[in-house]
UniProtKB/Swiss-Prot annotation:
ADP-alpha-D-glucose binds at residue 15. This is Glycogen synthase. It comes from Desulfitobacterium hafniense (strain DSM 10664 / DCB-2). It catalyses: [(1->4)-alpha-D-glucosyl](n) + ADP-alpha-D-glucose = [(1->4)-alpha-D-glucosyl](n+1) + ADP + H(+). Pathway: Glycan biosynthesis; glycogen biosynthesis. InterPro entries: Glyco_trans_1, GS/SS, Starch_synth_cat_dom. The lineage of its organism: Bacteria, Bacillati, Bacillota, Clostridia, Eubacteriales. Its EC number is 2.4.1.21. GO terms for biological process: glycogen biosynthetic process.
Length: 467
């Protein structure tokens, strides 16, 4: 069973967010599960030079895109035992950023078409399944039907489309349909692509793939309803029998942290943040984009009350200016209790994950979320809102059964967040044995990529044998 993994990011070549981790770690885990997998992505100019220099050119060809015929260079690099293919076109990918340019629709329509054209030239590899990720590759299933249905090379190729975040759909003016996509006939109809007068790439991926997955079971249920469906809930309801939720994983820290490590990490963090060295004062943390989706409104609404508790809080992240400014003003008003560090530093982030006692993630919605899983892998206890992958990964602690690995609250309400924090702080300070049991539960939680890969392998096999 051969799988071509079409994605726009893969660490260490390019990473702007969690998708880059998926592009690296899921293929590795799938290969361990016996899947013959290869990854294909754009050759961005931002890829580090040491990797660019090691790439081998396989083929140069042209990619049809409506009235255009665009150059494509197909290159290969083997990394960590995985074959990575890179699609080279300086016009589309020699840019200062991966996303956000004005011709993004054309840029990623080209990438989707180039993925399919490259199948002709992959050495000794004809995929049984093409696994597409988010709107940037969502046209692959549609193009496969529109332009390759009569080509015997493409017979029996199945497509799997994974939604990582439904909020970002790739919506463009209606002119894109003919001028960029080159579609006509039934597959160009409004039912296939149209979205309030525009063209919606994500909609095409959902409608035309053989199977749809998203990144947690709860999110798969949520997006079938208007509040979470971002205007596509009706389309998703129409595919509900082909929709599955599979949690992402996180790389396990090595060596696996212990509670003894936790104490040492806590001391290092206190020293770095200039917090008083006091084991009785819990360190709360938040590592996040500072945007409304992540629950910043809830946090700020009750931040005075949180800081009135005998706690310390560190916030690391960057985002909307008004959230940054308000957090900085709070930090000035609570010196020694609140540290706000704007920006993102990988090393500091992992020191916070490892050294803090409590991790806050009060998101309005969260397709999967990886921060809470990273925190638990270090024995840091999450407080989360019950939504998406947060609900699937964080189980509220039960003092009766001794089961559970964190604290949760249901409604998007600031005082529910405050109550959960008060409850956690009280347990930390007054129920030491219970807190230690909670930490042990968090440390033993399985969020490995191997678990995710086993589920995807089952999906691949189902598609493969349905031919």
């Amino acid at each position: 069973m051969k799988v071509l993994f079409a994605i726009t990011e893969a660490e260490p070549f390019v990473k702007t967010g969690g998708l880059g981790e998926v592009g690296r770690y899921l293929p590795l885990a799938l290969q361990e599960q016996g899947v013959e997998i290869r990854v294909i992505l754009p050759q961005y100019s931002s890829i580090p030079r040491n990797y660019l220099q090691k790439m081998k050119t396989i083929k140069e060809f042209t990619v049809p895109l409506a009235w255009r015929n665009q150059y494509c260079g197909l290159k290969e690099l083997k990394y960590e035992g995985i074959h990575y293919y890179f699609l080279d076109n300086e016009y589309y990918f020699r840019r200062s950023r991966c996303y956000g340019d004005g011709d993004e629709g054309e840029q990623y329509a080209y990438f989707s078409r180039a993925v399919l054209e490259s199948v002709r030239y992959l050495p000794e590899f004809k995929p049984d399944i093409i696994h597409c990720h988010d709107w940037h590759t969502a046209l692959v299933p549609l193009f496969l039907k529109a332009f390759y249905a009569q080509d015997t090379l493409y017979y029996n190729i199945k497509t799997l489309f994974t939604i990582h975040n439904l909020k970002y759909q790739g919506i463009f003016p209606r002119e894109v349909r003919e001028d960029v996509l080159g579609l006509s006939g039934e597959l160009s109809s409004s039912a296939q692509l149209e979205f309030y007068g525009g063209v919606n790439f994500m909609k095409a991926g959902i409608m035309h793939s053989d199977q749809v997955t998203t990144v947690s079971p709860t999110y798969a249920r949520e997006i079938q309803h208007p509040y979470f469906g971002e205007g596509l809930h009706g389309v998703i309801q129409g595919r509900k029998d082909s929709l599955l939720g599979i949690l992402n994983g996180v790389p396990r820290p090595w060596p696996s942290p212990t509670l003894a490590d936790k104490r040492a990490n806590r001391m290092k963090l206190q020293e770095q943040l200039n917090f008083t060295n006091n084991e009785e004062i819990p360190i709360l943390s938040m590592i996040s984009r500072l945007v409304e989706q992540k629950g910043l409104d809830l946090l700020l609404h009750v931040l005075d009350e949180i800081l009135a508790l005998d706690i310390r809080l560190v916030v690391l992240g960057t985002g909307d200016a008004h959230y940054e400014e308000r957090l900085q003003r709070f930090a000035e008003g609570y010196p020694g209790k609140l540290r706000v560090i704007l920006g993102y530093q990988e090393e500091l982030a992992h020191r916070i994950y490892a050294g803090a006692d409590i991790f806050l993630m009060p998101s309005r919605f969260e397709p999967c979320g990886i921060a809470q899983m990273i925190a638990m892998s270090y024995g840091t206890i999450p407080i989360v809102r019950e939504t998406g992958g947060l609900k699937d990964t964080v189980r509220p602690y039960s003092p009766i059964s001794g089961e559970g690995n964190g604290f949760t609250f249901t409604d998007y309400n600031a005082h529910e967040l405050l109550y959960a924090i008060q409850k956690a702080v009280e347990m930390f300070r007054n129920q030491k044995d219970t807190w230690q049991k909670l930490q042990e539960n968090a440390l033993s939680s399985d969020f490995s990529w191997n678990r995710s890969a086993a589920r995807y392998r089952d999906v691949y096999e189902s598609l493969y044998y349905s031919s």
